[in-house]
A protein has these predicted regions:
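N-terminal beta-strand motif that seeds the catalytic metal site of vicinal oxygen chelate
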Residues: 1-13, 43, 58-61, 117-128
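Vicinal oxygen chelate
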Residues: 12, 62-110
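Short beta->alpha transition motifs characteristic of CBS
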Residues: 49, 95-96, 102, 113-120
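A short linear hydrophobic-aromatic micro-motif
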Residues: 26, 46-47, 84-89
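Short acidic/glycine-enriched loop/turn segments that link adjacent beta-strands
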Residues: 31-34, 55, 94-99
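Short, charged/polar surface micro-motifs in flexible loops or helix N-caps
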Residues: 40-45, 53-56, 66-71
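Core segments of cupin and vicinal oxygen chelate
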Residues: 2, 6-45
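Conserved catalytic-core motifs of GNAT/GCN5-like acyltransferases
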Residues: 26-31, 90-92, 114-121
């Protein structure tokens, strides 16, 4: 399990260069307007969306897990707490097919608890 930080950036090339140096890490996935890093230390999934018009730099937060049982457990726990905003099964997003559950904090910050099933050649639905 690792925390995910998804950022809106003005220039994907500039951001990739900066974060590669900051974390001494190589890009795990690179597509037009998109990149992600799977960083071992500290355990972090860093996702970059080229989105210069975004009013906020923080896009959303998440927790990446590696087993569907963890997504189902999080869904049950969040549902019992009345916190589930949506559940997505086998949904393509960020050049990957994923199972996930979403919750929104009291200030409107979106959190996802997700597992990547497989890579995809397409980004998925339009970014927000």
């Amino acid at each position: 399990m690792r925390v995910q930080l998804a950022l809106n950036v003005n220039d994907i090339d500039e951001a990739v260069e900066f974060y590669s140096k900051l974390f001494d890490a190589k890009v795990s996935k690179r597509k037009p307007g998109y990149a992600n890093f799977s960083i071992d230390e500290p355990p972090l999934k860093l996702v970059l969306f080229e989105n210069p018009e975004a009013g906020e730099r923080l896009n959303h937060l998440g927790v990446e897990v590696f087993d569907d049982a963890d997504v189902h457990a999080a869904t049950g726990r969040l549902r019992s707490a009345g916190m589930v905003s949506s559940v997505e099964d086998a949904k393509t997003c960020c050049y990957a097919t994923q199972n996930k559950v979403w919750a929104v904090d009291p200030q409107g910050m979106r959190w996802e608890w997700y597992r990547v099933i497989e890579d995809s050649d397409t980004f998925g639905p339009a970014r927000d």
